[in-house]
Every structure is written in C-alpha cells, then in structure tokens.
C-alpha cells in the first residue's frame, strides 16, 4: 500500500484508515479490480461509489472531502501550493529514487550498476538541496502548517536517508523531518526502516 495513501488516511482523523489486504497486490489482476482500475496498479479506492486510482489523486480527494482544515487549512491557495509539491516530487525526485531502490534493493546483484547508483544519488541530492533552500523561513513546503504537499516529499526523503548514502548537510530538511515525526501517521507508516527496506530488517511491507 503506497505510503501517501496510508499516511493521508491516518491524518484525516481517528476514523481515517485504509484497509490493507494481504497476498500483496495479488488482487489487482482480476476482472473486478480491472473494472475499477484498468491499469491493474495500486492503490485504488471505492469511497461510496467514487472510484479513484493514482496515489496523489486519492490523497488530494481524501484531504478535500474529509480533512480540508487539517490537511491544507481550508485554503484553496494552500491546496494548490501543496499540490504543486506533490506533482514535483512525483516527477523530479521519485524517478532517481526509484533507480536507487532497484539497484540497491530489488535487482539481482549481477544486474546492479554502481554508476546508476551514483548518478541517481547525485540527482536526489540536487533535489534535496533545492528543498532545503525552500524551507528557509518556512516550517513546511506549502507554508507554516503541515499539508498534503509534505506527504510524498517526506516519504521520499525518509527513504533516501534510510539508504545511508553520502549527502551534504541539510539542516532545514532535518528539522522538517523532525516536525513530520510529531505526527503519529508519519511515525507509524513512514519513519520505520522496514517500511522502506524490508530486506535489511527481515520483514516485508504489506
């Protein structure tokens, strides 16, 4: 289950939760599932007949419908600023991070490339430096309060930090991560190492 969806649901309030099925992702290759999501990918939600797929779309929907005050201060301007960071994370940070996951965790050793790892590390670091500069004078990415914009960035940053790769000093990002850690959803679903790198802890993600 993508952390964006789990964390957003955990943040909507005490009754906000996401059911996580077992047999990891095996249910996606069925006619019933494909009728909801023709891509056969996760996640997909059916909220009273509102069927949605793609993590960021679902997070934005959950925030607007169930927790606008909690997740973007009820402000359309703040929502738009948060959304721009969600989109930016998806296209600017995640491709290089995905390459790191493949070449450090998922591919057989014979298929891993040290050159790809280093190039991807440098690309992520460049984005982190941009993020660190953005946080000057701002507690979070869309302003002074936690929003949906911090969710994908927090997930990606935490995962990169767990890799233990070389990085420059990023004091504002470290303070921002500490602030994210004040949220129980972040502590439960994002901070633990096993949520990102199960092979290093002897566990797997659901």
PLM features per residue range, with description:
Residues 1-118, 132:
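GST-like domain detector, emphasizing the conserved glutathione-binding G-site
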Residues 9-11, 148, 193-194:
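Short, solvent-exposed turn/loop segments enriched in Gly/Ser/Thr/Pro and often Arg
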Residues 14-17, 179, 199-200:
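Short Asp/Glu-rich motifs
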Residues 56, 185-186, 191, 198:
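Compositionally biased, intrinsically disordered low-complexity segments enriched
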Residues 73, 86-185, 189:
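GST-like fold's C-terminal all-alpha helical module
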Residues 193-206:
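Acidic/histidine-enriched, glycine/proline-rich intrinsically disordered or flexible terminal extensions
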């Amino acid at each position: 289950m993508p952390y964006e969806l789990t964390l957003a649901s955990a943040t909507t309030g005490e009754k906000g939760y996401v059911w996580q099925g077992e047999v990891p992702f095996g249910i996606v290759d069925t006619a019933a599932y494909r009728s909801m999501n023709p891509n056969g990918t996760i996640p997909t939600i059916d909220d009273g007949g509102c069927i949605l797929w793609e993590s960021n779309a679902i997070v934005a929907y959950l925030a607007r419908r169930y927790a606008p005050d909690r997740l973007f201060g009820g402000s359309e301007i703040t929502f738009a600023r948060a959304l721009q960071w969600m989109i930016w994370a998806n296209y600017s940070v995640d491709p290089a991070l995905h390459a790191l996951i493949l070449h450090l965790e998922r591919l057989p050793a014979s298929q891993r490339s040290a050159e790809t790892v280093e190039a991807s590390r440098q690309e992520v670091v460049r984005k982190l430096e941009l993020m660190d500069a953005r946080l000057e004078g701002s507690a979070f990415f869309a302003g002074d309060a936690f929003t949906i914009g911090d969710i994908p960035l927090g997930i990606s940053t935490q995962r990169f930090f767990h890799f233990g790769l070389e990085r420059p000093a990023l004091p504002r990002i470290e303070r921002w991560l500490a602030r994210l850690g004040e949220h129980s959803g972040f502590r439960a679903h994002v901070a633990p190492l096993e949520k990102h790198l199960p092979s290093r802890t002897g566990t797997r993600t659901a």
